[in-house]
Amino acid sequence: MLRMVLIVLGIFLFQNKAAAVSVDTEEGLKAELQKEEGDNVIEISKNMEMSGDLGKAGRPSLTIDGGGNLIDGKSHAGFSVGKGQDFSLLNTEMQNFSALFGGVVNNQGKMETVNGDFSVNSAKGSGGVIYNTGEINQINGSFEQNFADKSGGAVYNNGGTIEEIGGTFVENSAGDKGGAVANVKVLFKQGNIASVNGTFDGNSAEAGGAIYNNATLGSVTGTFSGNRAAAEYDAAQGGAIANEGQIDFVSGTFSGNVAEGAYQAQGGGHLS
């Protein structure tokens, strides 16, 4: 009986070990990423610098485990997740990625987890780090000095669904709305975020220095300090949070958040 248990355990461990493949070069990462069949986990074992866009995964289900290694995008675009795909991004340190929408990840499919350290990523449109029109279960990590020309300096939820956003958001900025996070509706599709909880420090935008919402947001909790809404030709809204939709619950510590407009600021420094 013991022998049989050990054999079964050995098979189980072998199968789980075989489910991951390790890569240590950009070429290796892209080759594994594009395969239509293969292991479900790609483990990155060394720091990397990109010479081109990462692009879309070839197979329907994939997890990227960064192993805490740094991936420098060198101003190239990150991952693209298509409809019907399952994708997770774990233990990553990603910087200097840039795209039209979602510098690091543009998600139209389903993502279980996004976590890691994300810094100095950008979008010419919205979503300096993450642009979502699909489903994401959990976003957690450190987001610092990311930028979007339009909205969502770190995270832009465009009619999609996100269960949880957490972490530390420092000095992210957007040219329009949501210095760190923007949750918006599109046509008849309501953007929905169940909860946002984190530390928001020194983020900035014209409306919602830290968070902008015109869709549905369940709860917002955390620490908000030194966030700023500033508009050169219009009225700034909500130094910390600007809400033009539905937020069910807001609680936290608010200090030093400001709203400064070309004329009257709307909603004051903390919440509009």
Give the ranges of each region predicted by the language model.
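Generic short beta-strand segments
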Residues: 45-49, 253
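Sec-dependent signal peptide recognition
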Residues: 1-7
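Acidic Gly/Asp/Thr-rich repetitive segments characteristic of extracellular carbohydrate-active
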Residues: 19-41
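Extracellular beta-strand repeat scaffolds in secreted/surface proteins
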Residues: 40-44, 165
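Glycine-centered low-complexity coil/loop motifs and glycine-rich tracts
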Residues: 70-78, 92-104, 117-129, 141-154, ...
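Extracellular beta-strand-rich solenoid/capping regions of secreted or surface-exposed proteins
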Residues: 49-63, 71-90, 95-110, 125-127, ...
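All-beta strand scaffolds that present successive hydrophobic residues in beta-strands
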Residues: 62-66, 86-91, 111-118, 136-143, ...
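N-terminal signal peptide c-region/cleavage motif recognized by signal peptidases
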Residues: 14-15
